[in-house]
């Protein structure tokens, strides 16, 4: 197999190709491992020009403009290959390439630092308000509701549910490029309700911790609840750009109930998705990310939850009671340490049998009819549900003090938790989120 030129290229450029991309290219050649040498050229020519891969290209620091231009010129000469989206914040772009085009890029573009396979990312789906002590948080005689705070739900979209009436103030669609809010999967709508449902359709019974917060739907996952690294990065960069364009009414919080397997790079910042969320954090956006649903094994924290900066949220099973006495960590909730040996998750929030908003006729709504609660609500479990609940409590903190930095919000959330004495922080994090204890003041 080593006689094939592309296999030799992979070996020579292993430091510039991430592991999934190396494996993808090599897998193309496995069926031809025992092919006679005189047929190698024939089969390789077919492979090089017919197979197509979606990739993310990272350029050397300070070379984004030049690198993007050079890559575009190379791909113009290649069949079935093209540049797609630019990610200026993280010095990358996405592209579709054949093996032949990949070879040309690595040979002719000296500004390329690394090329990543554009891997799949999925929605992390496997009483909540009361259990997190967010039913009524009063400061200075005012009940905090998240009013004036904007949360971007980076997910499958948001259905304009009656419990969100008048508060979906923006929508961006990286999947189908639609302009009006919708959710063909249902996961994003449930998460939006976990943040900010008013409970209007249930006389307040099923309301989120921030029932007056504004929402922006950023659709990065498709009808089946999956997307790609490029889709997610594009959504995150859209949020950063939104704030640059709207400095007086910015996105304060991003809730991301999604993730993919965390690969072991030299350090977590080599992960393009980690770099994207850390750019958002540095731009002043509080980022809440799901830990993942691959527990109870250790080292199962998903990406981008492996980022040291962001708030990584695990799932608590509150056993459908407001008391914390019977709370346990959900068996499915991913555990640390991360693949980089860092402690995670940061915090736990309710994530089992959470009742929130239903998106009628969506993919999940049709698939799990037994999970419907009346005509307006739906039950789901997962760190996907815990994450927006934590984001909703962060909204209360920012309503009380809008000038706090993301680091300060994270510290308040961790310091305000209900703690388990002498428990492993790689399972329990800092403890269970507690709105009453986390919001400063009396």
UniProtKB/Swiss-Prot annotation:
Gene3D superfamilies: Peptidase S8/S53 domain. It is an enzyme of class 3 (hydrolase). The keyword Transferase does not apply. Keywords: Cytoplasm, Hydrolase, Protease, Serine protease. Residues 122-439 form the Peptidase S8 domain. Induction: Is expressed during the late stationary phase of growth. Is down-regulated by SinR. GO terms for biological process: proteolysis. Disruption phenotype: Cells lacking this gene show normal growth and sporulation. The active site is at residues 155, 187, 384. It holds the Pfam family Peptidase_S8. It is found in: Cytoplasm. Is completely inhibited by phenylmethanesulphonylfluoride (PMSF) in vitro. One of its GO terms (molecular function) is serine-type endopeptidase activity. Its EC number is 3.4.21.-. It comes from the Bacteria. GO terms for cellular component: cytoplasm. Belongs to the peptidase S8 family. This is Serine protease AprX.
């Amino acid at each position: 197999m080593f006689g094939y030129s592309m296999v030799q290229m992979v070996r020579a450029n292993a430091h510039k190709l991430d592991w999934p991309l190396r494996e993808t290219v090599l897998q193309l050649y496995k069926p031809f491992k025992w092919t006679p040498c005189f047929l190698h050229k024939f089969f390789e020519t077919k492979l090089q020009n017919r197979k197509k891969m979606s990739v993310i290209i990272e350029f050397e620091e300070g070379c984004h403009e030049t690198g993007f231009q050079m890559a575009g010129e190379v791909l113009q000469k290649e069949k079935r290959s093209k540049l797609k989206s630019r990610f200026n914040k993280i010095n990358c772009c996405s592209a579709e390439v054949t093996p032949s085009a990949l070879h040309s890029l690595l040979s002719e573009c000296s500004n390329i630092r690394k090329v990543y396979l554009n891997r799949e990312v999925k929605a992390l789906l496997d009483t909540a308000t009361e259990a997190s002590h967010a039913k009524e948080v009063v400061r200075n005689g005012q009940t905090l509701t998240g009013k004036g705070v904007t949360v971007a739900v980076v997910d499958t979209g948001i259905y304009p549910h009656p419990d969100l009436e008048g508060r979906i103030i923006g929508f961006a669609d990286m999947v189908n490029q639609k302009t009006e809010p919708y959710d063909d999967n249902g996961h994003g709508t449930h998460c939006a309700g976990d943040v900010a449902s008013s409970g209007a359709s249930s006389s307040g019974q099923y309301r989120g911790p921030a029932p007056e917060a504004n929402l922006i739907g950023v659709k990065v996952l498709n009808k089946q609840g999956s997307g790609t690294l490029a889709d997610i990065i594009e959504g995150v960069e859209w949020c950063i750009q939104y704030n640059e364009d709207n400095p007086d009414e910015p996105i304060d919080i991003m809730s991301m109930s999604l993730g993919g397997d965390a690969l072991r790079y030299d350090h977590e910042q080599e992960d393009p998705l980690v770099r994207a969320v850390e750019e958002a954090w540095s731009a002043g956006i509080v980022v809440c990310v799901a830990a993942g649903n691959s527990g109870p094994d250790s080292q199962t924290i998903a990406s981008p939850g492996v980022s040291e900066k962001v708030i990584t949220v695990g799932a608590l099973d509150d056993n459908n009671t407001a008391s914390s006495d019977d709370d346990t960590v959900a068996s499915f909730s991913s555990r640390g340490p991360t693949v980089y040996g860092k402690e995670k998750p940061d915090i736990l929030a309710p994530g089992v049998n959470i009742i929130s908003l239903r998106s009628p006729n969506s993919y999940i709504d049709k698939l799990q009819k037994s999970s419907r609660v009346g005509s307006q609500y739906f039950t789901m479990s997962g760190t996907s549900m815990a994450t927006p609940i934590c984001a909703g409590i962060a909204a209360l903190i920012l309503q009380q003090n809008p000038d706090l930095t993301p680091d300060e919000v994270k510290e308040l959330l961790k310091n305000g938790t209900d703690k388990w004495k002498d428990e492993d922080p790689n399972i329990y994090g800092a403890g269970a989120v507690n709105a009453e204890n986390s919001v400063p003041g009396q």
